[in-house]
Amino acid sequence: MAKEKFSRNKPHVNIGTIGHVDHGKTTLTAAISAVLAVKYGGEMKDYDQIDNAPEERERGITIATSHIEYETAKRHYAHVDCPGHADYVKNMITGAAQMDGAILVIASTDGPMAQTREHILLSKQVGVPYIVVFMNKEDQLDPQDKEEMLELVEMEIRELLSTYDFPGDDTPIIAGSAFQALEEAKAGAVGPWGEKIVALMDAVDEYIPTPERDIDQAFLMPVEDVFSISGRGTVVTGRIEKGTIKVGEEIEIVGFGDTRKTTVTGVEMFRKEMDQGQAGDNCGILLRGIKKEDVERGQVLVKPGTITPHTKFRCEVYILSKEEGGRHTPFFSGYRPQFYVRTTDVTGSCTLPEGTEMVMPGDNVEMTVELVAPIALDKGTKFAIREGGRTVGAGVVAEIIA
């Protein structure tokens, strides 16, 4: 059976839901999908389909990132539902890197919570450029002091966004109930609650600009996952960071071990074949003569000769203060945290510049890092620094040394 062709008739934008566990991120994702399907046509994805990663079943919390697609009148969106639980922030770092903008979900019954802060901070660190806010669970507020509560929560949110250098005063904030909107849409209507979801997506359409894609640069795609398809070969999935890729083009697989060359035999997006994949697309790339065990998450697919694996670099980093959830104590030369780059984490040891004895939480510092394994790096590559399951800093590669 021939696959349906992917049509590119609207601008494409990657967004996602972030926020505290149980504030309604997945319900909102389902509500957006359902309301837009009723209003503009398209496939409705229900809550279970979105909340469908295998690990979650046991604990009732979202761990893996779930990708769905939907359309407004103006745009085609790929939406990633980000993990909410603190233990799975690692996944948020890899998931949030896939966003041109985010919808921050906050329960108006609770206001901002610990993970709300952590996700805003992470968004800043991993370079999510725009945030739109949805104040959820409006239907659960006492009608008598509802307006006052919403105003209070809104004020808190704006202050919090400004604290992390997002434009708190200008951020669109829409109140509603994802659950009620979803119920209306399931009954085939866009009712008063559904209209609030439409208003939210209008704000997303207007406020989150269509990103300038890095189409003209050399092809680069971080590997997120690798599958074996019987009779067809090995498929690598990820989001193309730069450039374009067509069937028949040669690429290199870079990182960890030896660099390998191969040829692209297929490009697909949402199970539809494409003539070419381009920057910003989440897609699957079929590779000739490559076994599943030859590729792993954390490597990158690149245009031959454009990027090489490195272990040593100079970087500019910001170390979080204790108040921001960072370390409580300083660190010294020889400190060995994990460096999260694109889709991978690698241990590295830090060397402080001469004359700098230690780095205090809240400091900005330039240091040299040597990784235990080579990964694809270039100047400007961003990373997070983590230790013992929490983010302690963020940085950017200033210069490659080796």
Curated annotation (Swiss-Prot):
GTP binds at residues 19-26, 81-85, 136-139. One of its GO terms (molecular function) is GTP binding. Residues 60-64 are annotated as: G2. GO terms for cellular component: cytosol. InterPro entries: EF-Tu_GTP-bd, EF-Tu_GTPase, EFTu-like_2, EFTU_2, G_TR_CS, P-loop_NTPase, Small_GTP-bd, T_Tr_GTP-bd_dom. Residues 81-84 are annotated as: G3. Its main location: cytoplasm. It catalyses: GTP + H2O = GDP + phosphate + H(+). Residues 19-26 are annotated as: G1. Residues 177-179 are annotated as: G5. Residues 136-139 are annotated as: G4. Keywords: Cytoplasm, Elongation factor, GTP-binding, Hydrolase, Magnesium, Metal-binding, Nucleotide-binding, Protein biosynthesis. Mg(2+) binds at T26. Residues 10-212 form the tr-type G domain. Its EC number is 3.6.5.3. GTP hydrolase that promotes the GTP-dependent binding of aminoacyl-tRNA to the A-site of ribosomes during protein biosynthesis. Belongs to the TRAFAC class translation factor GTPase superfamily. Classic translation factor GTPase family. EF-Tu/EF-1A subfamily. This is Elongation factor Tu. It comes from Aliarcobacter butzleri (strain RM4018) (Arcobacter butzleri).
